[in-house]
């Protein structure tokens, strides 16, 4: 049986080794490297599906944990699945719920069967297992589902992480057995291992034997220094299949998107562009702009003079500052629209640079303009 999702390799950048490819799914194809906006509760905050199409978002994320708790996977199944429910006709990836459960560290208990935990709002007792995660994701009907994994904290003791990745492998096998719709939903495995290179290798090799149609690197971008993350990605990549999509979870800052594309990753997601937009922080071609700052009060220029998105074509920095200061929802819509447009355009530029075998040159140009070449660059 042909997997529901396949990877087509187009070319490798001669200068950097980055990959240009196409991921084919039941709801359409997208070129990689690609950034995926996060729609936690079946909506990318403040953005309509039409606006997502306008900015060239090809695939979006849904969050299994949140959708299970509200409105419930049974309702979404009755609605015809997540695509119908939220009126999105492109590909959707759902996470397994694992990351959310593991972030409730003081409210949870990990066992071999799964994780017992308390609802983050009302305190009710809940249980999530590989089988339950598959049932929920099968009901949601996403194109790409993620295996239920344990996401160990970083740093963590070696023995703890080793036990954790071995449990993640056993859970991955249970996910494959429980997955009811492999013909129209692809299940990806998640490589863990914290900051231990031998454990990253062990996790990758064990999961590759299970022959998932795609693989993710999890447990990074959780607060470790970026050089550590880049080192782990570079090390882990060599144990990942060349003929399947590679997804780096939780990465969305411009520098990391470029650096990890260079290191052979294809897919990225992060709440960063939408989360910082709600505080009025914007990514621009000249670096970070905190639009609430007083210096923009009388600035009638566009947010980013080098951007041709709807926000930058139509509204001034002064107007955006006014809206954010006044806590007007429209301001958040405009900053969110711009940030997502900016990152999706960055990915387009990365793909073009790979086509032209000049991604390292592009990195230098971008870092210089964005202000990332200084000793302590501003981060988000």
From Swiss-Prot:
Signal peptide: none annotated. This is Queuine tRNA-ribosyltransferase. The lineage of its organism: Bacteria, Bacillati, Bacillota, Bacilli, Bacillales. Gene3D superfamilies: Queuine tRNA-ribosyltransferase-like. Keywords: Glycosyltransferase, Metal-binding, Queuosine biosynthesis, Transferase, tRNA processing, Zinc. Binds 1 zinc ion per subunit. HAMAP family: Q_tRNA_Tgt. Belongs to the queuine tRNA-ribosyltransferase family.
